[in-house]
Amino acid sequence: MKFIIKLFPEITIKSQSVRLRFIKILTGNIRNVLKHYDETLAVVRHWDNIEVRAKDENQRLAIRDALTRIPGIHHILEVEDVPFTDMHDIFEKALAQYREQLEGKTFCVRVKRRGKHEFSSIEVERYVGGGLNQHIESARVKLTNPDVTVHLEVEDDRLLLIKGRYEGIGGFPIGTQEDVLSLISGGFDSGVSSYMLMRRGCRVHYCFFNLGGAAHEIGVRQVAHYLWNRFGSSHRVRFVAINFEPVVGEILEKVDDGQMGVVLKRMMVRAASKVAERYGVQALVTGEALGQVSSQTLTNLRLIDNVSDTLILRPLISYDKEHIINLARQIGTEDFARTMPEYCGVISKSPTVKAIKAKIEAEEENFDFSILDKVVEEANNVDIREIAQQTQQEVVEVETVSGFGPNDVILDIRSVDEQDDKPLKVEGVDVVSLPFYKLSTKFGDLDQSKTWLLWCERGVMSRLQALYLREQGFANVKVYRP
């Protein structure tokens, strides 16, 4: 089998040296992706296309599908490469290939020709088209908007019968641009923004800020692995997980409620910039869209950018949510995003939309920056190829209960402000307060002879924290959902 790879048009308008470099990189990317399907596969580059030849017919569909997901490819032609003697021979081969496909259809013939021949491309179109029209009674020629377009390519003494055309994702080959670090949360925005930078030729590494709980990290790892495996598997990338729970705890205790969102984002940018500098990455990528939430106003984004010299790319800055969700659906991350928990432990009740720099800096003076340095130093760096094996390990499920027994105690893990606004009172059972950001250090001090029923407003935080505690060896935890 043979495939002809057509280049993304922006590649073809580059200077000769740049075009050759892009084609060379794309050829290497194709080899890296397809070698898993057929080790005997051959990839040959030309000035205006790339040929892929493989022997294992059983892998035809898999190879074709993989090619449509490699950045830099405009479209793929699946062809049958045969010799020919003259124009009538071209017609006979086209008739044998397309007879069944043209029954009862309108059609036209389009020919591309390279090399020296006694005929022109238009002459071949007329001869083959007329012959097909005569020999297939139910077929009819229609030059504009036909049901079927018969594509033929003539190159020297070879005829390429095009059996199918399949659209690629376009863009530039990965590796033609410099590396970036995507701040991935597993939601709609960060997945789409990561894809857009891969499509533009960047090798995308991933940085995840874990706000508490293994289940959330496993979910985000699966999203990152899916994006890499589907669109970027030609290159090795990193997945860096930073335990941001201590930072969140410090913010909740030391920072004014209205400034929390902006301060948290500034801390994330500081941490990600340190990671980027460590690995020689040139830019950060976020899924922020203008005005989508309170921290994404121009004033707040400017304040967030000011904490680092690292370039921050926001490919979705002018996109609305509906457009982003449609893109997530197209690339296959929608289902991941819909089931990803909305982790909102640091959402202010009255967040500022126009933060003042002096006020933000004054709030940050209360913050212990050694905590930030420590979590970055202890960040977990994983080769993304190892994630598939790690995520196959079962996550311990935690029992969810709606009632309680004589030995049960409800543990309210909401932030202090939330508890003050809406105190939890349940008849017939004790209620103890311990904010989620203190669980990792304070839960062990509680009476371990009791069964602790973790509770929060939405049930997401309580489940994540219960999973975390189970991983730490505490079996006496459940989730309370009345």
Swiss-Prot record:
SMART domains: THUMP. Pathway: Cofactor biosynthesis; thiamine diphosphate biosynthesis. Keywords: ATP-binding, Cytoplasm, Disulfide bond, Nucleotide-binding, Redox-active center, RNA-binding, Thiamine biosynthesis, Transferase, tRNA-binding. GO terms for molecular function: ATP binding; CCA tRNA nucleotidyltransferase activity; tRNA binding; tRNA-uracil-4 sulfurtransferase activity. Transmembrane segments: none annotated. InterPro entries: Rhodanese-like_dom (IPR001763), Rhodanese-like_dom_sf (IPR036873), Rossmann-like_a/b/a_fold (IPR014729), ThiI_AANH (IPR020536), ThiI_fer (IPR054173), ThiI_N (IPR049961), THII_Thiazole_biosynth_dom (IPR026340), THUMP_dom (IPR004114). Residues 61-165 form the THUMP domain. NCBIfam families: ThiI_C_thiazole, tRNA uracil 4-sulfurtransferase ThiI. This is tRNA sulfurtransferase. It comes from Salmonella newport (strain SL254).
